[in-house]
C-alpha cells in the first residue's frame, strides 16, 4: 500500500504544521484529513494554489487562534458537573462520553463540539477528572469534570471530601481464621 502526499491546511497533532507536505496512509487521508478540510492532495495545481493562498490561510489561522486564546482566558478553570447513576462501589452504569462533556460545557457557556473534547481514558467511575478541550489545534484548556450521583455529592467532591463509596469485597471469599496446623506424617 503506497502513501498519499498531502499539504496540511492547518496544524494536525502528531503530523505537522500548516503548509507541511506529509505522506500518510490512504485511509487516513480519505477518511479524516480530506473530508475534515485539514489537508489537500499535493499535486502541482494544489501546490500553486496553496502558495497563492498561503498568506490568507495564515491570517485566518492567526485570527482563529487569537479568538481561541481569548476564549481560553475567559473559560480558564471551567468545571462541569455530570449527574449519573452508579453502584455502591462508585462504578457508573455506562460511561461518560465526549458528547456528555460537550453538552455540559455548552450549558456552562463554552460552545464545544464533541470532537474538541479529548479524553485520555474512559470515565467509568464517580470522581473528579481533568479533560482537555481543544479550542484550536494550538490552543486547549483543561476542564474539570465532576461525576457524581447528586448535586450534594458533587459539591462534597468539589470541596475535596471523600464520598461514601463502598469498597467491593472479592466475591466467593469468606474470611475465617483457621488455627489448625497440618502435620506431615513421620517417615519410619
Curated annotation (Swiss-Prot):
SUPFAM superfamilies in the cross-refs: L9 N-domain-like, Ribosomal protein L9 C-domain
Taxonomy, superkingdom: Bacteria
CC annotations in GO: ribonucleoprotein complex; ribosome
Stored PROSITE patterns: RIBOSOMAL_L9
Gene Ontology molecular-function annotations: rRNA binding; structural constituent of ribosome
Composition bias, Basic and acidic residues: 149-170
Ribosomal protein found in the keyword field: yes
Gene3D superfamilies for the chain: Ribosomal protein L9, C-terminal domain, Ribosomal protein L9, N-terminal domain
GO biological process: translation
Annotated region described as Disordered, given as residue ranges: 149-188
Annotated keywords: Ribonucleoprotein, Ribosomal protein, RNA-binding, rRNA-binding
Similarity comment text for this entry: Belongs to the bacterial ribosomal protein bL9 family.
Function statement: Binds to the 23S rRNA.
NCBIfam families, sorted: L9 (TIGR00158)
Protein name, per record: Large ribosomal subunit protein bL9
Originating species: Gluconacetobacter diazotrophicus (strain ATCC 49037 / DSM 5601 / CCUG 37298 / CIP 103539 / LMG 7603 / PAl5)
Gene responsible for this protein: rplI
